[in-house]
UniProtKB/Swiss-Prot annotation:
It comes from the Bacteria. This is Large ribosomal subunit protein bL34. Residues 1-16, 31-42 have a biased composition (Basic residues). Residues 1-53 are annotated as: Disordered. It comes from Bacteroides thetaiotaomicron (strain ATCC 29148 / DSM 2079 / JCM 5827 / CCUG 10774 / NCTC 10582 / VPI-5482 / E50). Belongs to the bacterial ribosomal protein bL34 family.
């Protein structure tokens, strides 16, 4: 049986990246909460900053 987690950086960024979070009110709320908590990485996009993926 195939495992359920088949990692893909492209899908990961498209679903959980910064621009996707900013696209909806709830996503912006997620970012605000993570900022308030003092998270170093707000989104998965922060792992790549500037690199090609």
């Amino acid at each position: 049986m195939k495992r359920t987690f088949q990692p893909s950086n492209r899908k990961r960024k498209n679903k959980h990246g910064f621009r996707e979070r900013m696209a909806s009110a709830n996503g912006r709320r997620v970012l605000a909460a993570r900022r308030a908590k003092g998270r170093k990485k707000l989104t998965v996009s922060d792992e790549y900053n500037g690199q090609k993926w």
